[in-house]
């Protein structure tokens, strides 16, 4: 065997031996993604918050955003319920991300991030957004309800996940450990 053939075979063997480690290396470099559509109930009244969002989380920041409608759900009011505010939101500083387990490419856990809300009227304000994802069918629960918690200190408003009778949440959240990027 010639020296060049030996080196080629040796390099190929090293590459093949490294393949099992590749998914772990690739996974360590990817961000966790989040997606949700949820309804929150005001902790001190009949207001509701419909909110959607998606994005990614890296060790320093949450990147993403979505849309929201804040409305008065007083049963005495006719449909359509009056909208109190509507607009978009943008994720900001990461407070914490705790992944408690995975099931395939899905993950359960709790994401806490700072966010900026922008109203169509031009008003903007800060909030803390907590996205809580449980994967009950995988036996993974954070101990908190599925959904999104929003605290808006400037207005003294707090929203918690709303539920159907029986405790099933109005909305879904999901984290993923896989992010496809075109190109």
Which sequence ranges carry the predicted segments?
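Aromatic side chains
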Residues: 6, 34-36, 89
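Compositionally biased, intrinsically disordered low-complexity segments
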Residues: 12, 86, 134, 153, ...
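Predominantly extracellular/secreted and cell-surface proteins with exposed
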Residues: 49-132
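Intrinsically disordered, low-complexity, compositionally biased regions/tails
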Residues: 16, 68-70, 89-91, 96, ...
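Extracytosolic low-complexity repeat regions of secreted or lipid-anchored proteins
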Residues: 106-165
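N-terminal export signals
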Residues: 5-24
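N-terminal segment immediately downstream of the Sec signal-peptide cleavage site
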Residues: 25-79, 161-183
């Amino acid at each position: 065997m010639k020296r060049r053939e030996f080196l080629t075979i040796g390099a190929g063997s090293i590459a093949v031996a490294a393949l099992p480690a590749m998914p772990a290396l690739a996974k360590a470099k990817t961000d966790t993604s989040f997606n949700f559509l949820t309804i929150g109930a005001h902790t001190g009244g009949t207001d509701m918050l419909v909110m959607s969002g998606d994005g990614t989380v890296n060790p320093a920041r949450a990147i993403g955003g979505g849309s929201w409608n804040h409305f008065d759900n007083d049963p005495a009011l006719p449909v359509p319920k009056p909208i109190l505010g509507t607009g978009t939101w943008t994720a900001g500083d990461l407070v914490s991300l705790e992944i408690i387990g995975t099931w395939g490419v899905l993950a359960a856990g709790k994401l806490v991030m700072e966010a900026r809300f922008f109203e169509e009227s031009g008003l903007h304000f800060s909030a803390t957004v907590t996205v809580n994802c449980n994967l009950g069918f995988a036996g993974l629960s954070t101990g908190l309800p599925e959904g999104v918690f929003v605290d808006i200190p400037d207005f003294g408003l707090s929203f918690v996940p709303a539920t159907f009778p029986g405790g099933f949440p109005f909305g879904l959240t999901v984290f993923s450990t896989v992010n496809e990027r075109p190109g």
